[in-house]
Amino acid sequence: MLGWILYQKDTLQDSYENTRFLEEAKLLQITLKVVHPPDFGWVLGGDFPLLYKGKAISLPDFVIPRLGAMTDTLTWNLLHFFHLKGVRLFNSLSLIRLAQNKLDCLFQLASLGIPVPKTTALHLVESTYSIQRVFDFPLVVKNNVGTHGEGIILCTSDQILEDLMPILLEQTNQNFIVQEYVDTRPGEDIRIVLTQNTVLGTMKRIAGRDQWKSNFTLGGKVEPYPWDDSLDSIASKIQKNLTFDLLGIDLLMTESGYVVNEINSAPGFKGMELALKNNMARLILEQCIEFVPG
């Protein structure tokens, strides 16, 4: 069986995950390679071979896209090509696109009755006065497309927001959202990793010293977190209503319960393996083996 990990060149964020995938693939007798979207050439409408670094190459049995929010137009085109040719993608195109857009994702979750933080699009509230009518300080401003805790700003006062607004509104090629800052458990969140049918793991992420973002990639700590009925209800709704192979869910803890902050179509699992001492790479690859046709 041949599989590819589709990954961005010169990016180290998921180097741990890629290494673990390659280690476990060898033990499972899967031929697995890390490949990069810009190195491919393809043509629609005809019997043309797929090219990789200028040479014809056979299609794999499956592809694991690991770009998440960094999935650009070039990569989208390549993923559509793979889909057209019958290559099994882990995840689906629809799930990758949904997870890439934070606001669309929150709309989808809210429509399922899943609690989400109070959120709006920045262009709908183009003055600090409008924001102050709805949100208390501190509040969070996020790039609508972002990953690994990047593009997130904590505004602690109306003056900081007022200074920031002109800069953000000039970024015509980017969209931003405004979100309440959930301070019930500051610097902490819950990460769930699950498949369509199974919960693979749950952990708490705790921000590092002088940090307010809990991402493990930013130096945060991780520890196991017990499963409970509220988490089960949220996970079950997502599993029943979204189609996916692998999903990371990030939740914040409020006084009234959990709220889902965002989802991730290519969740990192270094922290999960460290906290739970489980083999996430193997569990994910076993899903690939199970669902690849033939």
Regions found by a protein language model. Name each.
Residues 249-251:
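Hydrophobic residue at the +6 position relative to the catalytic HRD Asp in the kinase catalytic loop
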Residues 139, 200-201, 247, 259-261:
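Protein kinase-like catalytic core scaffold
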Residues 31, 88, 115, 138, ...:
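Residue-level detector of anion-binding/catalytic polar loops
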Residues 150, 154-242:
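Phosphate-binding site of ATP-dependent enzymes
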Residues 2-22, 57-58, 82-86, 94-182, ...:
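Active-site nucleotide/adenylate-binding loops and adjacent lid/helix of ATP-dependent enzymes
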Residues 230, 240-244, 253-294:
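C-terminal active-site "lid" helix and adjoining low-complexity regulatory extension at the edge
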Residues 1-90:
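ATP-binding N-terminal substructure of ATP-dependent carboxylate-amine bond-forming enzymes
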Residues 68-70, 144-146, 266:
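Short glycine-rich anion-binding loops that position phosphate/pyrophosphate groups of nucleotides
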